[in-house]
């Protein structure tokens, strides 16, 4: 079956037209969604930019614009309105050629594309193909965003547009980070390591280079806005806020007999051999006198190891110049595309879970909140002692929630299969806690012994909704599963009155109901029964004028009749009325326990616990159905909503047990009976 790209390309060829993307049109809102700039963008196709002679393409190049030139250096600049963090990420991607072709398919040209280009990006837990047309925003005839300086290669400008399309607009990229870019482009888990505070040592770098991860470093000194929006260079030639890739380490013996630890870095903006147009000017650079300290043999050996754009510097200079390392951990499948990673001895194995924080169901907030236990709970079973990298990614690019995660150890005697309850978290200290931040990604590196661990991904505040992906990478054996609560009845939610109470109006609750008998008899028929409309009148007359009065509505009355009517007459007796009223008082007592801050208003995230006290243990899916049916716009429930939910559940369980002929939690039901049961709820 042809892909969407193939269908569009075939259609454009048959009609001999250039494609216009209907999902990301050439309009102002595709550039700035929230802000309104004081000018209008003109959208131009790449070939039109070249034909206009306006200087929109590289002025110092006579070459015609192309999509991709494999021999060209990476010479992309952000333009007047582009983002330097994204340029840095694209520079790193371009230095990893096989991973580059995963994102930027090479079989595309400006001449044969008919205006449609495709890219592959890691988005919301999977690789997705993104299609864009080649209309780019310009100001006064010049490209407003990413553009080449001399090469006239436009893959970067079109890839930037594809990323903007995923985010909703170019403006949304203003809030992006290098971690976001590296994740989207490489599909890995990004971990930031401050070099000084993390006490980075040569051994740390060596261990990283034995695994399938890409190690980058950057000097994030405060940068000033440079001329022509070029990245700022430090006096030693190092670009500020640009990712340099760590290639290798080596030790060199000087003529004086001492050893110097060297670090090899790749300048992603250069593809020249060592000594030719090398930007780094410090010790061990081509013209440095430091080379006089080593023999010609050692010099030749070290230079032989350098690839295009690579250079040596001492480890001491490394930790002084660079302030942060950004490590991209890649799983085995992705790393196998890159030859230098494929041959490394340790490969990261990845397990992934995709979930959702849903208000009232799984959005419990961080461990500061009493609803923390309703968050998704993931069981990590570690077979071998090993390092693990845990990453939480929310599927929200604009206005992300504050997110993080907490982990607990589980050393119980039995294998955990159901969610841990609130008491567990009250009585146990967490094993680890990530930082919380309003970022798309939060990651944590830890060393775990063999055992079982429960991971709780959360938003910081309860009731905040978002989809998320949890990825866990390890070098050994481990399993990841989602814990779930089994749906069952723990207590009878609608107990019948004891026979003595029913006959003699015994007990305070029953006595208070018996006082309504005269009103009941006025409404009852000759058989002393009432229907839902008469029950409505009775409740209107009997219930006090507080929040319980809301239960006097026709919908609840219909539910009460359906719950207790076994004959199909649509009527109930006074004894059945008493049973309902006694249980209503009990339900109100439970409701009050969970609405102490504001009487009569139950926050949705407390519904699960309140229903558990009534007698229901419910799975996440069933809680989701209940919340969708009964939650109000402000994220709360009133007593009438709560009572309706309790009756609804009681009826559903009763209908199931009527059809259960011995099989555990399984029934076989005829279509007629199934429809009847559904309508009875």
Swiss-Prot record:
Ca(2+) binds at residues 565, 567, 569, 571. Localized to the salivary glands in the larva. One of its GO terms (molecular function) is calcium ion binding. GO terms for cellular component: cytoplasm. The keyword Metal-binding applies. Residues 552-587 form the EF-hand domain. Gene3D superfamilies: 2.60.120.380, Cysteine proteinases, EF-hand. It is found in: Cytoplasm. Coiled coil: none annotated. Residues 482-514 are annotated as: Linker. Residues 18-331 form the Calpain catalytic domain. Residues 332-481 are annotated as: Domain III. SMART domains: calpain_III (SM00720), CysPc (SM00230). It comes from the Eukaryota. Residues 515-681 are annotated as: Domain IV. Keywords: Calcium, Cytoplasm, Metal-binding. The keyword Protease does not apply. Not known; does not seem to have protease activity. Although strongly related to peptidase C2 proteins, it lack the essential Cys, His and Asn residues of the catalytic triad at positions 84, 242 and 267, respectively. Belongs to the peptidase C2 family. This is Calpain-C. It comes from Drosophila melanogaster (Fruit fly).
């Amino acid at each position: 079956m042809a892909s969407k790209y193939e269908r569009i390309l075939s259609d454009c060829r048959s009609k001999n037209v250039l494609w216009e993307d209907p999902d990301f049109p050439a309009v102002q809102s595709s550039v700035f969604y929230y802000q309104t700039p004081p000018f209008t963008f003109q959208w131009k196709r790449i070939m039109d930019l070249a034909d206009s002679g306006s200087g929109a393409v590289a002025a110092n190049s006579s070459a015609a614009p192309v999509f991709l030139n494999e021999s060209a250096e990476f010479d992309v600049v952000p333009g007047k309105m582009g983002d330097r963090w994204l340029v840095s990420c694209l520079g790193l991607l371009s230095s990893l050629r096989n991973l580059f072709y995963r994102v930027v398919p090479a079989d595309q040209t400006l001449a044969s594309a008919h205006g449609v280009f495709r890219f592959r990006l890691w988005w919301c837990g999977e690789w997705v193909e993104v299609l864009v047309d080649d209309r780019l925003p310009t100001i006064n005839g010049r490209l407003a965003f990413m553009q080449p300086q001399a090469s006239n290669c436009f893959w970067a400008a079109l890839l930037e547009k594809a990323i903007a399309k995923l985010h909703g607009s170019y403006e949304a990229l203003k809030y992006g980070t290098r971690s976001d870019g590296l994740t989207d482009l490489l599909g890995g888990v990004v971990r930031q390591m401050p070099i000084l505070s993390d006490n980075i040592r040569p051994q740390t770098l060596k261990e990283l280079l034995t695994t399938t991860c890409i190690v980058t470093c950057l000097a994030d000194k405060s940068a000033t806005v440079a001329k022509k929006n070029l990245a700022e260079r430090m006096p030693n030639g190092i670009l500020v806020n640009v990712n340099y890739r760590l290639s290798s380490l080596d030790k060199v013996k000087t003529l004086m007999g001492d050893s110097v630890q060297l670090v090899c870095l790749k300048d992603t903006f250069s593809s020249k051999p060592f000594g030719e147009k090398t930007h780094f000017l410090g010790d061990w650079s081509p013209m440095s006198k430091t080379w006089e300290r080593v023999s010609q043999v050692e010099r030749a050996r070290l230079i032989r190891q350098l690839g295009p754009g690579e250079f040596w510097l001492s480890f001491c200079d490394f930790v002084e110049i660079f302030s942060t390392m950004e490590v991209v951990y890649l799983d085995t499948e992705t790393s196998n595309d890159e030859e230098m990673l494929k041959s490394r001895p340790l490969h990261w194995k990845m397990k992934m879970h995709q979930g959702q924080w849903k208000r009232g169901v799984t959005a419990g907030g961080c461990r500061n909140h009493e609803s923390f236990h309703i968050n998704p709970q993931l069981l990590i079973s570690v077979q071998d002692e090993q390092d693990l990298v845990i990453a939480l990614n929310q599927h929200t690019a604009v206005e992300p929630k504050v997110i993080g995660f907490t982990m607990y150890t589980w050393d119980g005697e039995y294998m955990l299969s159901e969610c841990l309850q609130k008491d567990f978290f009250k009585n146990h200290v967490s094993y680890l806690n990530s930082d919380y931040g309003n970022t798309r990604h939060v990651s944590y590196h830890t060393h775990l012994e063999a055992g079982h661990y429960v991971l709780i991904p959360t938003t910081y505040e309860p009731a905040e909704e978002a989809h998320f992906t949890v990825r866990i990478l390890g070098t050994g054996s481990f399993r990841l599963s989602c814990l779930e609560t089994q749906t069952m009845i723990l207590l009878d939610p609608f107990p019948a009155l004891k026979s003595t109470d029913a006959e003699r109006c015994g007990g305070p609750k029953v006595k208070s109901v018996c006082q309504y008998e005269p009103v009941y008899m006025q409404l009852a028929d000759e058989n002393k029964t009432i229907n839902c409309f008469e029950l409505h009148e009775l409740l209107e007359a009997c219930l006090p004028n507080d929040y319980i009065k809301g239960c006097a509505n026709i919908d609840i009355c219909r539910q009460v009749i359906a719950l207790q009517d076994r004959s199909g007459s649509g009527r109930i007796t006074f004894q059945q009325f008493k049973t309902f009223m006694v249980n209503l008082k009990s339900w109100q007592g439970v409701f009050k326990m969970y609405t102490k801050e504001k009487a009569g208003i139950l926050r949705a995230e407390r519904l699960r616990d309140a229903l558990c006290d009534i007698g229901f243990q419910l799975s996440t899916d069933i809680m989701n159905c209940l919340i969708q049916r009964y939650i109000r716009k402000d994220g709360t429930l009133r007593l009438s909503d709560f009572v309706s939910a309790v009756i609804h559940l009681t009826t559903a369980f009763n209908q199931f047990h009527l059809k259960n002929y011995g099989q555990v939690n399984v029934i076989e039901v005829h279509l007629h009976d199934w429809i009847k049961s559904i309508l009875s709820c």
